[in-house]
Amino acid sequence: MADPTIDKPSNITPLRDNRLSTAGRPAKPAPAFIFGHDDDSGPELEILGAGTKAASQIAAPQGVDLASKKKIIFWIGRGKTGKTTGIRWSAEAAILDGTTLLMADMDPTNDTFSKYIDNVARPPQASDPVLSLKWLDKLLQHALRHGVSLLVDLGGGDTTLRRLVTELPDLVAMIEAQGFAIVLFYTVGPQEEDLSPLATMEGLGFRPTATAIVLNEAMAEIGDPPENAFARTLRHSAFLAAVERGAVPIWMPRLLPAQQVEIRRLKFHDAAAGEIGQGKTPLGPFDRSRVLNWLQAMDANFAGVKTWMP
């Protein structure tokens, strides 16, 4: 879009040459205009658990080492918080590494994960809470019995895991006794309500050591620094309590051509490689580069919890 034209009011005198005033003295230069600078020029608010200033400056946090463990991994988040993007990235990386794992899509309202990745199981009636609970129960036992890691997509409004935890308050200890570890990735945007799945599960006492809070930069307005967009989230009591007990905050970078990748139904690495998918043309060279840079940024941001992956 072209820059808007601003008409000069007729009663405004044109600016004089700044080099000399009428008296021959140098004129005082006008204050420089920086868009957004005057909106919030105060000092940064000190927030416990948010000791860095911007996503690009945050060092990858180090999580507990789970390299020797099989894992039960849940990605949990409300709609439009980047949950499916995150779990797709995780699944693709595991598949490229040749990792044997089980995958399940239990989001009752969004089955995108199972549409992008092959061999993802899904309950016959994902919207039926009773059948979904039985299905998850049997799926977990199947993974434990066969010693295979499991990757599960749970919707933010899904109550299946919550009801299972209510029935089995010792679920974490029971799974750990089988030589497995439970890993939770909560995806959140700038809305405080996005913390509700985290607050609910933490309130039930479901607090695995390997818990990450994934702050999705794509949910912030373009041009708004992430530390500003997520300020209320970063100082919310639910976030601070989870971080205080050991949860790891991780920034998920924005993928600018996400829609173009989705239109073509492409895996991220295929998009970067110039595959066509269900589209008529591949991504252009700029967007392919953006996807590749995003993949590299994801690897860097999640490096501290690399052993939490399948």
Predicted regions, residues:
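Extreme N-terminal, non-catalytic leader segments
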Residues: 2-73
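The conserved Walker
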Residues: 79
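Conserved glycine(s) of the Walker
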Residues: 82
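Hydrophobic positions on the alpha1 helix immediately C-terminal to the Walker A/P-loop
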Residues: 85-86
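Short beta-strand-centered segment that lines the nucleotide-binding/catalytic pocket of NTP-utilizing
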Residues: 97-112
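P-loop NTPase switch/communication element
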Residues: 109-125
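Conserved catalytic-core segment of NTP-binding enzymes
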Residues: 160-263
